[in-house]
Amino acid sequence: MAMQKLFTYIYEFIEYRKMVLLEEKVPYDKFVQMIFNTGFFRINAETLNHGIVSVFIFGANGKYVHHGGDMRTLLTNALNEKKQYEELILIVDKPILGKKNILDIIVEQRAANPTVVINIYPYHLFCINIPKVSAIPRHKLITQEEAQAFLGREYLQPQDLMQISASDPPVVWLGGRPGDFVQIERPSETAMHAVVIRYITKSKI
């Protein structure tokens, strides 16, 4: 069931982020077959800035999420393809996020590739279309200029704002990065919406 949802919503995520697929979408049975046979499924897409984003969906029991050397080789080879990488998104079963050998490789690859955003997330972030969940307030990234104008009006510094993690589900779907600002519209008893600004901080993983 998780794989069926992942297959559906990862493509909705790519569309929501306004990315363009670089390969034709495969049928679901081929998606499952590739994860079962090779241990992962990869989607390549291009951003509005012409950067490349590669999404890797890993099987829960494949070699890449249990053997650090295999994960290191896979990521190193991908990043050596000389593409204009903007981001690598690694999607794994939640227990993998507790494996030190895998997380150490993520840290290692980030240090070796400082211009590429490398993030690892659990399946459940992509098993639902987060922006369509009615219980979640609307989130929107604002520009640095808009944020500075707001801070100036309110006589605030970024550190004065309440924070939100880069791993928060709506921020992940938006593509927010540490140092960005997100505007959140919450229902209000005195107005249609109460607008708040949050400062995005680095995630723990």
From Swiss-Prot:
GO MF term set: DNA binding; DNA-directed RNA polymerase activity
Organism in which the protein naturally occurs: African swine fever virus (isolate Pig/Kenya/KEN-50/1950)
Top-level lineage group: Viruses
Family (UniProt): Belongs to the archaeal RpoH/eukaryotic RPB5 RNA polymerase subunit family.
Keywords of this entry: DNA-directed RNA polymerase, Host cytoplasm, Transcription, Viral transcription, Virion
Pfam families in the cross-refs: RNA_pol_Rpb5_C
GO process annotations (BP): transcription by RNA polymerase II; transcription elongation by RNA polymerase I; tRNA transcription by RNA polymerase III; viral transcription
Protein name: DNA-directed RNA polymerase RPB5 homolog
Stated role: Component of the DNA-directed RNA polymerase (RNAP) that catalyzes the transcription in the cytoplasm of viral DNA into RNA using the four ribonucleoside triphosphates as substrates.
PANTHER family, per database record: DNA-DIRECTED RNA POLYMERASES I, II, AND III SUBUNIT RPABC1 (PTHR10535:SF0)
Compartment(s) where it occurs, according to its Swiss-Prot or TrEMBL record: Host cytoplasm; Virion
InterPro entries, alphabetized: Arch_Rpo5/euc_Rpb5 (IPR014381), RNA_pol_subH/Rpb5_C (IPR000783), RPB5-like_sf (IPR035913)
Subunit structure: Part of the viral DNA-directed RNA polymerase that consists of 8 polII-like subunits (RPB1, RPB2, RPB3, RPB5, RPB6, RPB7, RPB9, RPB10), a capping enzyme and a termination factor.
